[in-house]
Amino acid sequence: MGATGDAEQPRGPSGAERGGLELGDAGAAGQLVLTNPWNIMIKHRQVQRRGRRSQMTTSFTDPAISMDLLRAVLQPSINEEIQTVFNKYMKFFQKAALNVRDNVGEEVDAEQLIQEACRSCLEQAKLLFSDGEKVIPRLTHELPGIKRGRQAEEECAHRGSPLPKKRKGRPPGHILSSDRAAAGMVWKPKSCEPIRREGPKWDPARLNESTTFVLGSRANKALGMGGTRGRIYIKHPHLFKYAADPQDKHWLAEQHHMRATGGKMAYLLIEEDIRDLAASDDYRGCLDLKLEELKSFVLPSWMVEKMRKYMETLRTENEHRAVEAPPQT
């Protein structure tokens, strides 16, 4: 009995002395159940502390997670600075895209060309942070002729023999046509098949505030070409079409004439021209005609004025080409 009392002394005050009852007092003989609430709380706090320590260790010892967390915090600021850089050079991309559209044809989507050029810039910028031992990837859409030229330049640079400088200016016609064919573009010489932009349909005076217009996408569906986007522009390049700028698209979206398209192109056509096409021999009796798709609308004076200037520019350009063309013998 005395030994048992000595063994129980280190347990400290009993539950009754602390104002509580220990479950060990009610247990079976010879079994000590430590149910001191203070001990339970101490153990629980230790478990929680150990759990937090392990989680913190996992997060901060993984370099990929740590760097990605930092990148996610800095990404909005980085995006703003990248957008500022692109805005600085956007005027060059816009001029180049418009020049391509003038040379190739009106069916070229200038906005899409700009977006692709910006994405290519970002892809090439990745090479700034690539390993020196890795091979620099080539663009998939580079033309074969350009690839051969660059490879020859690199080989001559290794040999130390300089290449003769190329003369600036437009390449010969046969080279230009072969390059375009390699890129997958259907090229038609303008000298053989000129686009006629003359006559009463190209008279800017016909455009006024009462003139009704339709979206190019709806005109495409109305003439039975809804399955192929932009087919109407390829089949009828003589039609006057106006590419809406961001200000025009904002007004059209506010008036519920079109949905917000973001960076996509939106063309406006004259409703009278579309109905004249539908009544022509090419479409008369066509079962795919859906003229009910033409949801016409009128435009404000400031937009009509821009369309007049645009039509006058195209018409005047064709007149100059007709004057400069040599007489046929």
Swiss-Prot record:
It is found in: Nucleus. A motif (Nuclear localization signal) lies at residues 164-170. Residues 147-158 have a biased composition (Basic and acidic residues). Residues 1-22, 147-178 are annotated as: Disordered. The modification Phosphoserine is found at residue 161. The keyword Phosphoprotein applies. Residues 56-147 are annotated as: Important for dimerization. Residues 197-316 are annotated as: Important for DNA and nucleosome binding. InterPro entries: DNTTIP1_dimer, TdIF1, TdIF1_C. Keywords: DNA-binding, Nucleus, Phosphoprotein, Transcription, Transcription regulation. Residues 159-173, 216-237 bind DNA. The keyword Transcription applies. GO terms for molecular function: DNA binding; nucleosome binding; protein homodimerization activity. GO terms for cellular component: chromosome; histone deacetylase complex; nucleolus; nucleoplasm; nucleus. Increases DNTT terminal deoxynucleotidyltransferase activity (in vitro). Also acts as a transcriptional regulator, binding to the consensus sequence 5'-GNTGCATG-3' following an AT-tract. Associates with RAB20 promoter and positively regulates its transcription. Binds DNA and nucleosomes; may recruit HDAC1 complexes to nucleosomes or naked DNA. Monomer and homodimer. A minor proportion may form homotrimers. Interacts with ZNF541. Interacts with the terminal deoxynucleotidyltransferase DNTT. Interacts with TRERF1. Identified in a histone deacetylase complex that contains DNTTIP1, HDAC1 and MIDEAS; this complex assembles into a tetramer that contains four copies of each protein chain. Component of a histone deacetylase complex containing DNTTIP1, ZNF541, HDAC1 and HDAC2. Identified in a complex with KCTD19, HDAC1, HDAC2 and ZNF541. The N-terminal domain mediates dimerization. The C-terminal domain mediates interaction with DNA and nucleosomes. It contains a HTH motif that mediates recognition of the consensus sequence. This is Deoxynucleotidyltransferase terminal-interacting protein 1. The gene is DNTTIP1.
